Amino acid sequence: DFVQVMWHGASLDATTAGYLTALPLLVMLVSIWLKRVPLKKLLLPYYIIGAALIAIVFVVDMGLYPFWGFKLDASIFLYLDSPKEAMASVSVGFILLRLLVMVLLTGGIAWLMMKITPRELETVKNKILGTLGMLLLGGFLFVIIRGGVTESTSNVGQVYFSSNQFLNHSAVNPCFSLLSSMGKSK
C-alpha cells in the first residue's frame, strides 16, 4: 500500500515541486545575462518562506486529518476566525509538539535548499544557448505543473486509486489540496 500511495501521489508532488521551482528557474534565467548574481542571497528569503509554508501545511494537515477525516483545504480559514474555539479541543503539548516539528522542518528544508544552491552561477559563455536551455527547462516545468499534455490538468482526484479512502487521501499532496481548494472557493 505504501508504494502505491507514493506512486500515485508522485504526480501531485511533482506539480507542487514545479510551482515551487518556477521562481528559482527565473532567477537562474536572469543570471545568465548578468554577472555574478548572488543566487544564495537572492533565494534565501524565498527558501525560508517557502519552507515555513510547506512545514505549516504538512504539519497542520497531519494534525487535523485524524479529527476531520479529510485533507486540509480552504475550510481551515473558517476556523482561523475563532482560533480559541478551534484550539480548545487539543492540549498545549499537542500544539507545542507540532510547532517544534514545523520549526525543525522549516530549518531542514531551508538548509537543504541552501546547500544545493550555488553561491553564484559560473559565467555562461554562450548566453543564447544558455537561455534556450533554460527556456526548454521552463517548458518542461510548465508541463509538470500542468500535469501533462492531455486535456485534463492536475487535480486532487487524479491520485485516487483505491476503494480505501485513507489511501487515496494519503496520496494527495496537502499543499496542492489546500491551494486547489482555495482556487475553487473564490
What role is predicted for each listed range?
Residues D1-K184:
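Transmembrane and membrane-interface helices of multi-pass
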